[in-house]
């Protein structure tokens, strides 16, 4: 029996935007709420590109719940947005600010350690008023069950805790979602991987190089041929005193191309176009990475089981449709709606109905349609058909296709700024590589700037991170190259000819034959979860407060 365990009305696991939104809404409605955060501080385990959107149509925005957040915890308002289509040293830039502002009340660049750390203080104050609170360095390992029913959570550091509501806001690598059988990590095509460098740049230098004031900021996105055919693209966001520069790629494409993701980041950082903004004084503050769910494929339509609900990345709620990525805003909406559903169910004397109410609210509010757009579902059979995609690529690269692109130069910007068109964008090379490259070749201009940036080597990037190394938290189940070799290149802190990362290729001689195998060292792990998808591993988080701690996020 579990009656002797400590009990709360609600337990929220994770204090990112989704968990913070849920906890704040619960506490403001008088619900006794305990928040459990795995990091030494909220944000120390979190990574985002990232731009936090507040959508006009959203049921909740983060400033609804935390009115001072923009003044206290975000970086810069992102007021302009551009996409740069690249072919060698030719670039065709398209202004997509109209798309950026579509349904947008505001959008700010953020660094997660700063923002989530501030949210932690607000959430702790709110939940303490209702008999709860917030604890850091607590690793929630799974669900507490009684007679097969979910009744609470288990942790590595504390006795089990009972709760009437469990909000799993524990991120893309959610152990609660996996324990419940609601999410899995089986298919690389269902995930993206983001890799980022935070680059030091004083505010006055940002103002000069980007031509912006203190209350302005820019987003720059990159696609085309600079990534050797890997599907995805790059980003640059202006922060107050730094730049966030990185890439987001389809994980299956990284695996198929055996691409080394740190080298793909360097390809962006050293492109002549970025010489416009980066100088010889280039200095990286932090290197980071994370796994990103592709919501149109994995956003769970029924993100609940018993008294547990999933919010944010744990539920696959990350919208990457076209060049603009939205995730934190959907996590906020989901967290608020989950709390709202519990308050309503409790008031009717049936808190066990929270999941059904939450699911209905996600649909009725339009959140699920944004995450899993109908336009994509109805067109993907055609737009992602292998034969048709190959034909379209051939036509685009032909003389006829190039002539058509040149003749419609003035229409390109309108197409890029169409939310409807971008909601149908297929997951193929055509929109990520082929068309941007041809567009740059036919309509682009040669970059006049030079770029003298010399990015740090991978060992330097790892060496600059903060770790409190605990016990190994990943084991390789099948060390054969066929089963787990993809991790050697896909892992952001590993590479084929680098011996200081997590994954290494080794040749074992036995009975006169040689076999290629994979070995693992979890010490430099940045807990992105990539190897859980691309290799045969048993993966869990480190103990609370152990492992990597991001200073920027």
Language-model segments: residues:
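Iron-sulfur cluster-binding cysteine motifs and their immediate structural context
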Residues: 485-513, 519-553
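Short beta-strand to alpha-helix junction loop
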Residues: 100-121, 254-260
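Core beta-strand elements of the Rossmann-like FAD/NAD(P) dinucleotide-binding domain
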Residues: 5-8, 156-165, 304-307
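C-terminal helical "tail/cap" subdomain of flavin- and related membrane-associated enzymes
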Residues: 343-454
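Predominantly flavin-linked oxidoreductase catalytic cores and closely associated redox partners
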Residues: 41, 122-274
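N-terminal FAD cofactor-binding segment of flavoenzymes
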Residues: 29, 39-88
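N-terminal Rossmann-like FAD-binding beta1-loop-alpha1 element of flavoenzymes
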Residues: 5-35
